């Protein structure tokens, strides 16, 4: 089971107050429902591939409105042959849609979220939970990027969802897709906040556990890469210095170097694996800093380059 499916399964087990049940059901019917007329009767089909969500819708309708509800199961024939669950409401459809603030009294469609429906903070959370159950997805935190989104067919409702989420300081964004619109989150901290808002506390803990391990692993990898790069840089510099010292020795001899430079040159060749700090502790006459040693080695490099260029070097 995917992380998103586990999250939704957890959400379908939550207990709610009556006002919150109405807010969640409104989102589920609005986003997953479709209307049909048969024998002059209006019916509503709410379709989902998640059995737990279908049971949730069935229970909320029975509990909230005491109506006859049918539950149908069909097999998808294309691509993945998953079951499709259809919750069919065949009575009081018009009254229920109006009560859930999906249609007006004249049966015209309400495209945004009714403020009356989400007046309380708990109902705001519940509407977002219903919207996530109906059209939401969230990436497994083990994947390369963090992403949570809620899909809506029309812009007004999508904008309402974005506004509702940002009322909780989630910094959500909207984007038009080929067949609709999405409101999405990309920041891991905001995704965990959203999971907390809708009541997916087990999913939140799992997300955070995986994220912490992943971030620690990335930090260790960055540290190792940095140390490896520094080590390679140090080794490269040491090899260059030794090559230049040997070139000077083979062409004009190390006696051409001033005493302080000659001492460092001999130490560098004799102790090729030691650090600049350790070289500074080996010189006669007192300890020299890393920058002091580095300065002398650069002078040796300059002399080697002058010799390669055919210039005459005189001992100073």
Curated annotation (Swiss-Prot):
Keywords: Cell cycle, Cell division, DNA-binding. Residues 275-309 bind DNA. It comes from the Bacteria. GO terms for molecular function: DNA binding. It holds the Pfam family HTH_WhiA. Belongs to the WhiA family. Involved in cell division and chromosome segregation. HAMAP family: HTH_type_WhiA (MF_01420). This is Probable cell division protein WhiA. It comes from Bacillus cytotoxicus (strain DSM 22905 / CIP 110041 / 391-98 / NVH 391-98).
